[in-house]
Amino acid sequence: MKNLFACQHLALSAIQHAKGGHVGMALGASPILYTLWTKHIQFNPNCPKWINRDRLVMSAGHGSMALYPILHFAGLITKQEMLHHKYGQVNTSSHPEYAPNNFIDASTGPLGQGLGMAVGMALTQRVLAAEFKALSPKLFDHFTYVVVGDGDLQEGVSYEVAHLAGVYQLNKLIVLHDSNRVQMDSVVRDVSLENLQTRFTNMGWNYLETSDAVADIDAAIKQAKKSDKPTFIEVHTTIAKNTTLEDQPAGHWFIPTDKDFARFNSNTKTNFTPFEYPQTVYDFFHKQVIARQAKPVQAYKELLEKLKDKPLYTKFINWTENDYQALYLNQLDERKVAQANAATRNYLKDFLGQINNSNSNLYCLNADVARSCNIKLGDDNLHTNPHSRNIQVGIREFGMSTIMNGMALHGGVKVMGGTFLAFADYSKPAIRLGALMNLPTFYVYTHDSYQVGGDGPTHQPYDQLPMLRAIENVQVWRPCDEKETAAGVNYGLLSQDQTNVLILTRQALPSLEQSDSVQTLKGGYIISNRKQPDVIVAASGSEVQLALQLEQALNEQQLKTRVVSVPNINMLLSQPQSYLQQLFDPNSVLLTLEASASMEWYALAKYVKKHTHLGAFSFGESNDGQVVYEHKGFNVTNLLKLIKTLKS
């Protein structure tokens, strides 16, 4: 037990040095992490993101100090990093932060999402094992472990993803519950009457229960590994164990005092000095955590050597190295669409059809709207075909998005998902977290404006684009036709470290001769030009056709007009100033159009003499889409009035 107590003492020391932290779980869940790392987790100490490593997600991210001491004693985190817990150190941040070269498998903190990401990882292990079984069944035989707290299980998303794990029988997913019966403001029984055994068995899980003794946790994990279902292990722990706030809500977060160290030393019969521990502790963890990995890592290396000449090996390398250039470059032909002058969502179907082959590692998740959004590859699904690229998640948008993050974190697959734009709110917490981790997830949101029409204001998403565009590292594309759609799809497929969001229409839009897929990648470009224009009209998506209609009307009034298509306003604003000055003339007036509440358009005002913007700033109504659209001011007559005011 001395080595476990050393971990707990180091956690106390680091939290005290940081002037406070989540002591409760750091001590209570420590036996869970200790058991996992010293007896079960397989990984490659020299390759943190080894593709066949066991994954560990701290869904209850505030319990990070149950993990960091183990990594320190194993030689994977330095003493300096422990001394700077919470202050400028990615590897010992307050909540775990994923990085390409560290031993953290997911950034966590927003409760519930870690469980969803773990489900995504286990799901990816399942589909990759099936895809490469013919090459070797040992290529993807790892487990996914996730540590959850009571808060994780109270979040609604935990129900969404746990249900799906049961549906898909993800038997290599093992959840360990830090069940201490206490949370920050209350005891659990004050806010939850749930029987966890009933909950998880009803969802198709294996349920186990154990004490926090290392031997008991170890036995439960061994039993879970033999299950043909995902396993939920409820580990009965004690919050802030062996401190003055043991078993109390106040033990969730506090600054350890000398009395806490005295209580800890007395109860554990130890007398450690903060940040100074016997060499025997380091030796133990090196043997049990590091040296234990040599045999499985070497066996995997030898396996790959034997497979190098096999037909599937190149595909295996392209997938596991996330070589999107090899998989998707030059795969799309913008000219090959079933029908021109169509809704942009229809073009997505055309382009996905072009890459629907065995070499593609794209997997499509859909929230029960595949037929409406065209987010699908072929007509089968994972239930009927283990090699299918279509994963049904039901009406679980938030869960779907956390699973997408987990799949991207696992690696080996490209993942696309989406629904109607009005329901992007359900996914935003996961989009934000994925962007924070630089994950190349790909979202498609359709039914993008007032022109949804008869479904009414609940389905008319005037307010969604500004929220998506406000998230750092998210590229939002709103194309006006098939060429711009092809550019957005291609960019999203090739992206290595950015989240991409493609915004598509339900209503048909004209195919434009002047549009350009190459220029689209600049975020904006001149689609109809007049030198020294009197008026410049810039627009995105469905408003580009309106801008071109306005151009005709202005030409009749002898006003020289330039039209700029802006499929990605944030990307346009990131271009060099010299490029923006080519598009926008300082002697011209500028009208910008978008059926959205986005504010980014006002950043273009400094490049022109005068500017006004027509956006969408109120709920719509249940009516014909074009009627609603025009009622909100998106008609040539109203735009001419705006231009007249601008020119006055």
Swiss-Prot record:
GO biological process: pentose-phosphate shunt
Binding, substrate: 22, 252, 345, 372, 447, 455, 506
Molecular function per GO: metal ion binding; transketolase activity
Claim: Nucleotide-binding is one of the keywords in the record: no
Record text on cofactor binding: Binds 1 Mg(2+) ion per subunit. Can also utilize other divalent metal cations, such as Ca(2+), Mn(2+) and Co(2+). Binds 1 thiamine pyrophosphate per subunit.
GO cellular component: cytosol; membrane
Function description: Catalyzes the transfer of a two-carbon ketol group from a ketose donor to an aldose acceptor, via a covalent intermediate with the cofactor thiamine pyrophosphate.
Stated name of the protein: Transketolase
